[in-house]
Swiss-Prot record:
Residues 319-325, 391-427 are annotated as: Homodimerization. GO terms for biological process: diterpenoid biosynthetic process. The keyword Phosphoprotein does not apply. This is (E)-beta-caryophyllene synthase. The gene is TPS6. It comes from Origanum vulgare (Wild marjoram). Transmembrane segments: none annotated. It catalyses: (2E,6E)-farnesyl diphosphate = (-)-(E)-beta-caryophyllene + diphosphate; (2E,6E)-farnesyl diphosphate = alpha-humulene + diphosphate. A motif (DDXXD motif) lies at residues 313-317.
Length: 554
């Protein structure tokens, strides 16, 4: 996948060939090493007592869901807390049944209930679940210009709830756009005057990344702390969420231990020293998409896939010569190692490792009757290599593409088409050939995700890369300033999110695994590429995030 990097500089580098002038980038080394392998003994096994307590508490929460009155603020708050605590996957059927009922009884106008917090929460929960409910019931709190009415001017909880709800707007809902802006500015003003530290932290987190764009696992880690400080919290739910978090964390730690062993055997750090060495960061990426225990096999395989994609990007973008890349691409295209000795040593090492990952994928999927999906996965990896090669040809020939030419290639080189197809190929959920063909056709939701990925990547990497980017090309083509280009591209990111919201409402419930995959991958991009490239430089923000959910228990 394409990840922003610092400016490439030419240097004599001799991995695989002698005295060849190549580009090189001073990436920082792997910061985790064999941490998860060396600390395996510290990652305790889940005891029988913990499993029994976990099951007992889960049943208690189910009873709570059933016993609480339908469509009451307590029921809605309970569902919201369950989901934000990261344990919603245990109660999917119960929550869907409840929200289906709430949707069926959802009024176009609610003349009796004037509680903004409840109305906005209900609106958000239903849209999250894929129900296209109107925003009319929220309109009495917003004037025609999108400003908040005086009646709620100091209702921080209500405005925060409306802010979160407004993030689920779609194109054409201009009133929600205006409400979002009004809520943001009002919340920033109100938290300077509140003495409620917990509420202030909650608002600051929401303004940074709203619920709609938050990774479930990362959000759960933060929300557990906030929920604990809430005097009205449910003790059983809190205990269950903390136990579940720690149990799932141990599973993730053990998975990383096995993956670290694979990584050490590859020894790319020594054999391919020009490439970024980011195994744990790749696992974090995939875990952001699939954190639930049932996706154990998918996490293992997809971490290897994204790791290999990252190295592939560096082969094309940093190290390979044009002649080497031409020959290398032909081998990827054929998906055959016959005659591989024609390639430089570093390419032979890489290609054998790549093909081994797909052999493992085929073996694992054969066990669950999804062998048919592997060809789709391979074809997308081939296509990724082809677009990387196209970009390399542009670089070596000094060709400057038009914005249209660039985006056609760059949406694919963002890697999210490849990762989506590969992910759907290895998850346990049954994905039909018809659904694969639909995804391969690049439907609007996937195109919107790729636009966000590409533009966030280019915005984060602006000024630190010598290759083409949407920022440079837009400035040159439109004759605008850097600030204007950033403003326009951020607007495109915002509109693409609205398209994703729209498609989620349009396509549910038939394509839930596909929608979940696309949305979660897009959320990872928001977390890693807002304001900086936190993958290329994973020593600060990313390290802290990984530590919070993969090292430190709650």
């Amino acid at each position: 996948m394409e990840f922003p990097a610092s400016v490439a500089s030419l240097s004599a580098n001799t991995v695989g060939s002698n005295d060849v002038l190549r580009r090189s980038i001073a990436y920082h080394p792997n910061i985790w090493g064999d941490f998860f392998l060396a600390h395996t003994s510290e990652f305790m096994e889940i005891s029988i007592a913990e499993k029994e307590e976990h099951e007992r508490l889960k049943e208690e929460i189910k009873k709570l869901l059933v016993q609480t009155e339908y469509d009451s603020i307590l029921k809605l708050e309970l569902i919201d807390s369950i989901q934000r605590l990261g344990v919603g996957y245990h109660f999917e059927k119960e929550i869907d049944r409840i929200l289906r009922y709430v949707h069926q009884t959802y009024p176009i106008y609610d003349t009796e209930n004037k509680d903004l917090r409840m109305l906005a929460l209900r609106f958000r929960l239903l849209r999250q679940q894929g129900f296209h409910v109107p925003f009319d019931v929220l309109s009495e709190f917003i004037d025609a210009e999108g400003n908040l009415t005086e009646s709620i001017a100091y209702d921080i909880q209500g405005i925060l709830s409306l802010y979160e709800a407004s993030n689920y707007g779609v194109l054409g809902e201009e009133i929600l756009d205006k409400a979002l802006d009004s809520c943001s500015s009002r919340l920033e003003s109100l938290i300077t005057d509140t003495d409620d530290d917990r509420l202030s932290r909650q608002v600051k987190e929401a303004l940074k990344i709203p619920i709609s764009k938050t990774l479930t696992r990362l959000g759960a880690r933060k929300f557990i702390s906030m929920y604990k400080e809430d005097d009205s919290h449910n003790e059983k739910l809190l205990k269950f969420a903390m136990l579940d978090f720690n149990m799932v964390q141990r599973l993730h730690q053990n998975e990383l231990s096995h993956l670290t062993r694979w990584w050490k055997e590859l020894d790319f750090a020594n054999k391919l020293p020009f490439a970024r060495d980011r195994l744990v960061e790749c696992y974090f990426w995939i875990m952001g998409v699939y954190y639930e225990p049932r996706h154990e096999i998918a996490r293992k395989i997809l971490t290897k896939v994204i790791y290999m994609a990252s190295v592939l990007d560096d082969i094309y973008d940093v190290y390979g010569t044009l002649d080497e890349l031409t020959l290398f691409t032909s081998f990827v295209r054929r998906w055959d190692i016959s005659g591989i000795d024609e390639l430089p040593t570093y390419m032979r090492i890489y290609l054998r490792a790549l093909f081994d990952v797909y052999v493992e994928m085929e073996e694992e999927m054969g066990k669950i009757g999804k062998s048919y999906a592997i060809e789709y996965a391979k074809e997308e990896m081939k296509r990724l290599a082809e677009v990387y090669f196209q970009e390399a040809q542009w670089f070596f020939s000094k060709y400057k593409p038009t914005m249209q030419e660039y985006m056609k290639v760059a949406l694919l080189s963002s890697g999210y088409m490849m990762m989506t197809i590969n992910s759907l190929a290895v998850i346990k959920d049954p994905i039909t050939k018809k659904e694969f063909d639909w995804v391969v056709s690049e439907p609007p939701i996937l195109k919107s995700s790729s636009i966000i990925t590409r533009l966030m990547d280019d915005l984060a990497g602006y000024g630190s890369e010598e290759k083409h980017s949407a920022v440079h090309l837009y400035m040159n083509e439109k004759g605008v300033s850097e600030e204007e280009a950033f403003q326009e591209l951020r607007k495109q990111v915002k509109n693409s999110w609205k398209n994703i919201n729209k498609e989620c409402l349009k396509l549910r419930p038939a394509s839930v695994p596909i929608l979940t995959t696309v949305v979660n991958f897009t959320r990872v991009i928001i977390v890693l590429y807002t304001d900086e490239d936190a993958y290329g430089n994973s020593k600060t923000k990313t390290k802290d995030m990984i530590k919070s959910i993969l090292v430190d228990p709650v």
